[in-house]
């Protein structure tokens, strides 16, 4: 029910939410409360879901897009939860809003789609409400929404790759890192994060060590990544054996390096340039028309 017809004449604020890509992910421990400690090299692309926010007479949320049917549109959705969080955290500024999310990314796919959406809400409302709250402070508070939300908020604010430690709260900006041309591939199987972590047999792997100088060029980064891991790949592979086929498809299309992101099932390939990535995406989509295939360029310094 539309309670304020004038709202449609107010210009909406919108953004494309971050795609989060764990180029390396080491699980180095586990806290007493069960949270796993990680060290991760994380790159981003602002080409995820499309989120818009319009001041409205009452709160409303509409979910559309090719992957909308796989999500709930009620109070459990991270867009709604993030709005509730902002209203409760800044009650003196809280205002009702109409959010529309066009779900363009696969669900439960290891690229932080839900966390990116939550970060998008925080970023839009921080601007609309003219909050006197730094990105760093808001990121610290937003950890209650999920471990990936703070880093996604940093991606929207600073548009740079990050080195992330702890449960996701210890964030270092990588200001000298180069941009990457990549292809994302998802074969369609959802993989629950909790299921992958539960299947992880070893929780105290060696830490992630990578020289910041290696991040300056594609070739040096690819070489450095050979000495890193995604410690969640082995348990994810037991759940989704087709991950091996996805990685083979990326390698056969000319990827310089390929790996699963996060807990899966999305895998990425790094290519020498944007043209090579676009050609590879066309090749993979032709071979596997039912797969999600997306060429992207990651955020980095200008």
From Swiss-Prot:
ATP binds at residues 106-116. Catalyzes the phosphorylation of the position 2 hydroxy group of 4-diphosphocytidyl-2C-methyl-D-erythritol. It comes from Bartonella henselae (strain ATCC 49882 / DSM 28221 / CCUG 30454 / Houston 1). PANTHER family: 4-DIPHOSPHOCYTIDYL-2-C-METHYL-D-ERYTHRITOL KINASE, CHLOROPLASTIC (PTHR43527:SF2). Pathway: Isoprenoid biosynthesis; isopentenyl diphosphate biosynthesis via DXP pathway; isopentenyl diphosphate from 1-deoxy-D-xylulose 5-phosphate: step 3/6. Pfam families: GHMP_kinases_C, GHMP_kinases_N. GO terms for biological process: isopentenyl diphosphate biosynthetic process, methylerythritol 4-phosphate pathway; terpenoid biosynthetic process. The keyword Magnesium does not apply. Keywords: ATP-binding, Isoprene biosynthesis, Kinase, Nucleotide-binding, Transferase. Coiled coil: none annotated. InterPro entries: GHMP_kinase_C_dom, GHMP_kinase_C_sf, GHMP_kinase_N_dom, IspE, Ribosomal_Su5_D2-typ_SF, Ribsml_uS5_D2-typ_fold_subgr. GO terms for molecular function: 4-(cytidine 5'-diphospho)-2-C-methyl-D-erythritol kinase activity; ATP binding. Belongs to the GHMP kinase family. IspE subfamily. The active site is at residues 20, 148. SUPFAM superfamilies: GHMP Kinase, C-terminal domain, Ribosomal protein S5 domain 2-like. It catalyses: 4-CDP-2-C-methyl-D-erythritol + ATP = 4-CDP-2-C-methyl-D-erythritol 2-phosphate + ADP + H(+). Its EC number is 2.7.1.148. It comes from the Bacteria. Gene3D superfamilies: 3.30.230.10, GHMP kinase, C-terminal domain. This is 4-diphosphocytidyl-2-C-methyl-D-erythritol kinase.
């Amino acid at each position: 029910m539309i309670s304020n017809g004038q709202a449609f004449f107010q210009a909406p604020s919108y953004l494309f939410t971050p795609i989060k890509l764990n180029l390396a992910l080491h699980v180095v421990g586990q806290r007493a409360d069960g949270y796993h400690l990680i060290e991760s090299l994380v790159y981003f692309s602002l080409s995820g879901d499309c989120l818009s926010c319009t001041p409205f007479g009452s709160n409303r949320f509409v979910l559309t897009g090719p992957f909308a049917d796989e999500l709930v549109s009620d109070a459990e959705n991270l867009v709604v939860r993030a709005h509730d969080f902002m209203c409760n955290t800044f009650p003196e500024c809280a205002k009702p809003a109409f959010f529309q999310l066009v779900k363009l990314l696969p669900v439960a796919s290891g690229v932080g789609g839900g966390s990116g959406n939550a970060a998008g809400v925080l970023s839009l409302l921080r601007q609309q409400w003219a909050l006197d709250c730094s990105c760093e402070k808001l990121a610290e508070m937003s950890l209650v929404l999920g471990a990936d939300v703070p880093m996604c908020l940093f991606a929207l604010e600073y548009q740079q790759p990050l080195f992330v430690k702890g449960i996701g709260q210890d964030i270092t900006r990588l200001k000298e890192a180069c941009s990457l041309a990549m292809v994302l591939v998802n074969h369609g199987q959802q993989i629950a994060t909790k299921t992958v972590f539960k299947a992880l047999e070893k929780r105290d792997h060696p830490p992630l060590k990578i020289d910041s100088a290696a991040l300056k060029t594609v070739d040096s980064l690819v070489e450095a990544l050979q000495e890193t891991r995604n410690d969640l790949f082995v348990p994810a592979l037991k759940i989704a054996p087709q991950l091996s086929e996805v990685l083979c498809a990326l390698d056969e299309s000319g990827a310089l390096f390929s790996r699963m992101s996060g807990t899966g099932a999305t895998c990425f390939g790094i290519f020498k340039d944007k043209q090579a990535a676009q050609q590879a995406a066309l090749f993979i989509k032709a071979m596997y028309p039912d797969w999600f295939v997306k060429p992207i360029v990651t955020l980095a310094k200008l």
